[in-house]
Design a protein with these regions (language model features):
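C-terminal motif of bacterial Sec signal peptides marking the signal peptidase cleavage site
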Residues: 14-17
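N-terminal helix-rich structural modules
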Residues: 28-211, 215-219
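Bacterial signal peptide processing site
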Residues: 19-21
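An active-site-proximal "capping" alpha-helix that borders the catalytic cofactor pocket
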Residues: 213, 422-439
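Long, well-structured alpha-helical subdomains associated
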Residues: 434-531
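Contiguous, non-catalytic segments that form substrate-binding/exosite surfaces or channel walls
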Residues: 189-378, 382
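Post-HEXXH active-site segment of zinc metalloproteases
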Residues: 401-427
């Protein structure tokens, strides 16, 4: 068994990055950091755990293909490091020269966060001498402002403006500005990251030659082409059609690092093997979605009578997560791609990371349940309930209002709810996921024995999410739900401060909150959404007391990926 340590791989990637003609790395600075104990305490918020998958049943050729994909995944890791900040690579090289215990503590926490800012503490720098985290990351020129970029984009012809705002381009400074104003140019990722993407494309083509699975071969070949052409459409379609024992997600996807425009995609990789048994189990949940939509607790006119074809759901066990897929708090599931053309034609694939979820449950959620819930309800916190609710959360993102009409004009919930959208949508998926699971239990699709566990596990998981902070969408959404259900009487707080589900009111409370969120979404009611979040997305004293009891329980996991047999 070999352990994949990010440190060694990043050294290789950084060395390779130095040959890229478009790389701009800030000069290394003298680093002054907090004491070793403080850094180690910060790192202890993440519980180290081995993450791997059984690949013994894969034929030799598939195992070799998987090994090439892992190598390509590490290329994404190095690219993401550069995308976060132009100074990241120089700073890391500086850190690596110090092999003392203090130096290793510095490097460790840097790699956990993919930079010198604490992702659990509102991006507070944990090194002296570094700037605040750039909101535009390294997608835009250092020293430019959001207003500079917006003003420049307004001068562009429509086609160029679309490229400038696209997922797969950076904006760089040029000497061609006019009247003393800054000049900018559009640089495709295929040029900006040419050296690394050429290497990644070569590895994908090697993997394509090794696999005997046609849909995997097609995805790898088209994604290799995309790395060099900057056109990802065909490979996104091939990824949606992928039906293979190996499930790779690799390339530029999520846009969270671009805090200016949420436009630029960050490189990530999830290299995984499919869990066929668990994937088959989920198929029956997907088959129930139209029935759930038809019975949502909203006015019938607000329901979608035709959801369309069922998008793929995959349950996988991760072999490697890298880049944007492995920084700070780990994701447990994702919906991709983000290209609206592909989503219109093919939908979005939901991928559930089962081994990551199981690690979080054992190391974080179960211990939280033991401190938060009453003794009688602690035994009901189960991985099966946690996993099933996570699945239903992802599925419920696709149900309820999306395309709406406001003041006679067609629009979207996202556009109308603006800055409240993410928190309200996460809350909707959570609470309506409980509503949907109860319906499936009542219908006999899921066993009646799951009824208590879904609510008690949800309550324990609420405290897990609030620990991420109410400035983050998931944390705001769960705080709003928790306080609503407490006010409704569906969740009670005992004299000892322990929380409990009230069986007599929880179902009605879940239904009421599902109705309230979906109704305001259908109306595009920004004022009501803002009011709900202002009133309810807060940490009340009784919740704060419980959070204070969770000292010593990790906030999340630090995966250490293992590859037996590779």
């Amino acid at each position: 068994m070999r352990s994949l340590i990010a440190l060694g791989s990043l050294l290789v990637l950084i060395a390779a990055a130095c040959v890229s003609p478009t790389t701009t790395t800030a000069p290394a600075k003298e680093v002054v950091v907090p004491e070793q104990a403080k850094l180690e305490a910060a790192a202890a918020q993440y519980a180290p755990t081995d993450i791997g998958a059984d690949i013994s049943k894969l034929p030799a050729g598939e195992q070799q293909a998987l090994s090439r994909l892992v190598e390509a995944g590490w290329v994404m890791d190095g690219l993401f490091l550069r995308q976060v900040w132009a100074g990241n690579e120089g700073l890391l090289l500086n850190l690596l020269t110090d092999r003392s215990p203090l130096g290793q503590a510095r490097t460790h926490y840097f790699l956990l966060n993919k930079g010198p800012w604490d992702r659990l503490d509102h991006y507070t720098p944990f090194f002296a001498g570094v700037p605040p985290k750039p909101e535009g990351a390294n997608f835009y020129p250092a020293g430019s402002t959001k207003a500079d970029i917006e003003a420049w984009m307004k001068t562009l012809p429509e086609a160029e403006r679309a490229q400038a705002a696209g997922f797969f381009t950076t904006i760089r400074r040029t000497a061609n500005g006019k009247a003393g104003k800054p000049g900018f140019e559009i640089v495709p990722y295929s040029v900006e990251y040419q050296g690394e993407l050429t290497r990644a494309a070569d590895l994908l083509r090697e993997a394509a030659r090794l696999t005997a699975q046609p849909t995997l071969k097609k995805f790898l070949e088209t994604r290799a082409d995309a790395f060099l052409s900057n056109d990802y459409y065909a490979s996104d379609v091939a990824w949606m059609e992928l039906d293979a024992s190996i499930e790779p997600t690799i390339g530029p996807y999520e846009v969270y690092e671009d805090e200016w425009f949420n436009a630029k995609a960050a490189f990530e990789a999830f290299i995984a093997v499919r869990d066929d048994d668990e994937t088959a189990k989920l198929a029956k949940l997907g088959a129930e979605l139209q029935g759930i939509e038809d019975n949502l607790p909203i006015e019938p006119a607000l329901r979608n009578p035709k959801l369309g074809g069922m998008a793929p759901i995959r349950v996988v066990n991760v072999v490697l997560a890298a880049g944007d897929g492995n920084r700070g708090v780990q994701t447990t599931a994702y919906n991709l791609p983000n290209d609206e053309r592909v989503v219109r034609e093919k939908g979005a694939k939901r991928v559930m990371l089962r081994n990551v979820q199981e690690a979080k449950f054992n190391l974080v959620l179960r211990p939280i349940g033991a401190r938060v819930l009453t003794g009688a309800q602690q035994k009901n916190v189960t991985f099966d309930a946690f996993f099933t609710h996570t699945v239903m959360h992802e599925l419920m993102h696709g149900l309820g209002p999306h395309q709406i009409t406001v003041a006679g004009k067609a629009t979207t919930v996202r556009a109308q709810l603006k800055d409240t959208y993410s928190a309200m949508e996460e809350a909707k998926a959570d609470i309506s996921g409980l509503f949907a699971l109860q319906r499936l239990i009542d219908k006999g699709v899921l066993p009646r024995s799951m009824e208590e566990s879904i609510y008690d596990t949800y309550l324990a998981s609420a405290f897990r999410a609030i620990r991420f902070g109410v400035a983050e969408a998931h944390g705001r959404g769960i705080a709003m739900q928790l306080n609503f259900l407490i006010d409704f009487g569906a969740i009670t707080v005992g004299p000892d401060g322990a929380f409990a589900i009230n069986p007599a009111k929880i179902k009605d409370g879940v239904t009421a909150l599902t109705r309230e969120i979906m109704t305001l979404q259908a109306a595009g009611d920004y004022a009501k959404a803002k009011d709900m979040l202002t009133r309810l997305a807060v940490v009340r004293p009784e919740v704060k007391k419980v959070l204070d009891k969770l000292t010593g329980i990790p906030i999340d996991i630090e995966p250490r990926f293992t590859r037996p047999g590779l």
